[in-house]
C-alpha cells in the first residue's frame, strides 16, 4: 500500500503494551461473522486485562520427547481426532502428548481441572502458562492451559490443540454472541495446520459429525473406567421414605458411607396432596398448586397461606410431593439419624464435614469423592423442556462417575 502524498504519518513514539497477535485479529473477524457479534467483543476476550509492556524471554518451541499412552500418541498422529475415553481416565497423558509437539493450547472445562493439570505439567518440566493469569508467558509461546476464554490465548502459532471433555456446556458462552470454545480452538488449529484432539466420555453431535475419526480405548479398559450404575424404577414399588427413596437406596444410606444425593429442585416441596382422598392442594382464588410447610399450605410463587385442610374431604392429613433439596434433607435426617448437608449453587461451601450430602447438580462440583451418588429424580433431567436435555443428563452421569 502506497503512502498518501497529502498525509504525513507521525512517528510512533511509544508502545504502551502488547496486544493479541495478528492471527487473533483475523480470527475475531471470523468469529463475528459466524456468531453475529462484533469484532471488538472477541478482541476484548483475547486481550489481557492489564497493560503488558513487554513479553518475557521464554519459549515452548523446543519439543519434548516423552513416551505417553499409546492412544494419546495415536490420536495426535491423526492430525485431527475425536477420542472417546472413560470418565476416570487421567488427562495428563493427552496433555503430555500435546505439549511434546511444541506450542500447545489445552482447554479444560473447569478452573479446578485446569489448575490441577497446570501443576502436573509444571512438575513434569514443561514450560506452562495458566490462562488468563499468565497471559504474557502465553504470548511468548508457552504451553497454555485454561478454560473457555483460553481459546483466545495469544499464542503466536499453534503446534497442537487439545480440548478435554468437549461435551461440557461450560465451553459455550451464555451471553450473546454465544460462541463455543471448542469451535474457536479447532478453527485456530485449522489455520495453523496444527494437529488437534478432542476427548470426551460422551462426544457431542458436533464432534461425531465433524469428519474426524473416532478413536476409543480397549473395550475392557473403557468399561472399567465407568462407575457401576443401578437403574431403579419406582413406579411399582412402595417407597421406603417418602416418594424419593427406594429400598436399595435406603440400604446404602444406612451404611456408614459417604453418599451424595442430587436433585435439581430447591425448597421443601412443590406440591402437597390429601393423604385420605388424594386431592391436590390448590389455592382457592387462583387455583395454583400449594406446598406443605408445617400445618399450612403455602404457595411458592406469591406466598399465599391457608390452613392445611382438604377442600374435598376436610381431612387435615397431607403428604408432600415433588420434594426439593430442603425437603429431602429433612426426611433423610429422620431416616438415617445422621447429619445432612445441603448444597446449592447459592451456597459458598469449601468443605463438607458430613457423610450425607443433598443438593442440586452444584454438589457434584463441590464434593471431590463419594462412595455413592444418587439421582433422586432423573426423569426430570431426561424430560426437561429444554434443548439437548438428554445430552445434559448424560453429562451429569459422567460427572458423577468421576
Task: Please name every model-derived segment.
Residues 112-123, 318-346:
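Short, charged N-terminal beta->alpha structural module
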Residues 116, 120, 184, 210, ...:
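Alpha-helical scaffold elements adjacent to nucleotide-binding pockets in ATP/GTP-utilizing enzyme cores
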Residues 17-21, 107, 111, 175-178, ...:
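Conserved phosphate/pyrophosphate-binding and hydrolysis machinery centered on Walker-type P-loop NTPases
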Residues 127-140, 327, 337-361, 387:
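Conserved helicase ATPase core of P-loop NTP-dependent helicases/translocases
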Residues 377-402:
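Conserved RecA-like P-loop NTPase helicase motor core
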Residues 28, 145, 185, 261, ...:
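Conserved RecA-like P-loop NTPase ATPase core
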